[in-house]
From Swiss-Prot:
Catalytic activity: di-trans,octa-cis-undecaprenyl diphospho-N-acetyl-alpha-D-muramoyl-L-alanyl-D-glutamyl-meso-2,6-diaminopimeloyl-D-alanyl-D-alanine + UDP-N-acetyl-alpha-D-glucosamine = di-trans,octa-cis-undecaprenyl diphospho-[N-acetyl-alpha-D-glucosaminyl-(1->4)]-N-acetyl-alpha-D-muramoyl-L-alanyl-D-glutamyl-meso-2,6-diaminopimeloyl-D-alanyl-D-alanine + UDP + H(+)
Family: Belongs to the glycosyltransferase 28 family. MurG subfamily.
GO molecular function, one term: undecaprenyldiphospho-muramoylpentapeptide beta-N-acetylglucosaminyltransferase activity
Superkingdom of origin: Bacteria
Alphabetical list of PANTHER family matching this protein: GLYCOSYLTRANSFERASE, UDP-N-ACETYLGLUCOSAMINE--N-ACETYLMURAMYL-(PENTAPEPTIDE) PYROPHOSPHORYL-UNDECAPRENOL N-ACETYLGLUCOSAMINE TRANSFERASE 1
Pfam family for this entry, one: Glyco_tran_28_C
Organism: Methylorubrum extorquens (strain PA1)
Topology of this chain in the membrane: Peripheral membrane protein
UniProt name for this protein: UDP-N-acetylglucosamine--N-acetylmuramyl-(pentapeptide) pyrophosphoryl-undecaprenol N-acetylglucosamine transferase
Length: 369
């Protein structure tokens, strides 16, 4: 006898911020005996190796933003092509439900599912609803949110909103109970600097100049791990080599980033939703530099969720100068109690079983079809 096992189509853009929580949900669904397929865009190749999907469908996608009318028009044409690809994939896969994690790459498959009357669930990772999710919210059965307070949810959709938290990937859960490292007077000071899955040039410009301004005794204790874009890597490494640091490691990408976060006394980073949620899960204090220029200022809102409880400092990029960063580092490293208190505060902001909560919601929705 053939036993029917439902399939859920998970839709996520090909960057870590969207893909990591989608991956966590996929593992939780598979634990429930639910099959998973992934719809994403062409950027996924470098980071989708561990995604537990029986099939990965690449959908044409583009973002219709910017001042160029031609570029926006071209993006709309690409999204239309992606819609055709997505509609064929949804018909072929016949999913019991489709889950979208935001970003324009999710629009074609989510919209195709809605038009084909397949139930859809949105997950909004940020503290401000993105434009793609806002567009899709009207047709979604459920809107799950990563943060308790989320701005921009359409008024007519608020009754369908459920706070699940942001799904935490297994690699983070594996180190989530790591105690905060000792910070006695002679212990190494472990600083981790990164800018999201694609790096951030501002970190390579500001952080080395700030480290140069630290007192020599702090520099001698400092063990620095920093993500740098490939084009910035050599210059960044060369600047640090002359500073007399206790240790330095720089690379374009760290596959073992959760473990490095757990080893750190302090993290300097952007404030994407995954970064903020993982800092809370592991319980590490941070200096957060929200990505500027976003129309909805989602990273600033994300950072505020930790800053408001004393778990992080949020510094706008316009104020993120070598002098400001050096002053904050000296203040924190010379007053270890501030760091330990911030670490404890961060822990209060996390929902460790968010993936299971979201999986239960998806399974319930799929079973109702």
């Amino acid at each position: 006898m053939t036993v029917f096992t439902p399939l859920v189509l998970v839709c996520a853009g090909g960057t870590g911020g969207h893909l990591f929580p989608a991956q966590s949900l996929a593992y939780a669904l598979k634990d429930r005996g639910i099959r998973v397929a992934l719809a994403t865009d062409a950027r996924v190749d470098s980071i989708a190796g561990d995604f537990p999907a029986e099939e990965i469908v690449t959908i044409a996608s583009a973002t219709p933003s910017g001042r160029s009318v031609l570029r926006r028009a071209g993006a709309v044409v690409t999204l239309g092509r992606g819609f055709g690809q997505a509609a064929r994939a949804v018909r072929r896969l016949n999913p019991a439900a489709v889950v979208g994690f935001g970003g324009y790459p999710t629009v074609p498959p989510m919209l195709a599912a809605q038009l084909l009357r397949v139930p859809t669930i949105l997950h909004e990772q940020n503290a401000v609803m993105g434009r793609a999710n806002g567009f899709l919210a009207k047709g979604a059965r459920v809107i799950a949110t990563g943060f308790k307070e989320v701005r921009g949810v359409p008024e007519k959709a608020t009754a369908r909103r459920v706070h699940t938290g942001n799904p935490i990937r297994p690699a983070v859960l594996a180190v989530a109970e790591t105690p905060y490292p000792s910070l006695d007077a002679e212990a190494p000071l472990r600083l981790l600097v990164f800018g999201g899955s694609q790096g951030a040039r501002v970190m390579s410009e500001v952080v080395p100049a700030a480290i140069e301004k630290l007192p020599q005794d702090l520099r001698a204790r400092l063990h620095l791990v920093q993500q740098a874009r490939p084009e910035d890597l050599t210059a960044t490494q060369n600047r640090y080599l002359a500073m007399g640091l206790g240790g330095i490691e720089a690379a374009p990408f760290f596959k073992d980033l959760p473990g490095r976060m757990a080893s750190a006394h302090l993290v300097v980073a952007r404030s994407g939703a995954s970064t903020v949620s993982e800092l809370a899960a592991i319980g590490r204090p941070a200096i957060l530099v929200p990505l500027p220029g976003a129309l909805d200022q989602d990273q600033a809102a994300n950072a505020a969720t930790l800053a408001q409880i004393g778990a992080a400092l949020s510094i706008p990029q316009s104020a993120f100068t070598p002098d400001r960063l050096a002053a904050e580092l000296v203040d924190l490293f010379e007053a270890p109690r501030k760091l330990t208190q911030a670490a404890a505060a961060a822990k209060t902001a996390c929902i460790l079983d968010a993936a299971d909560r979201l999986a239960a919601l998806v399974a319930e929705t799929a079973a109702a079809t």
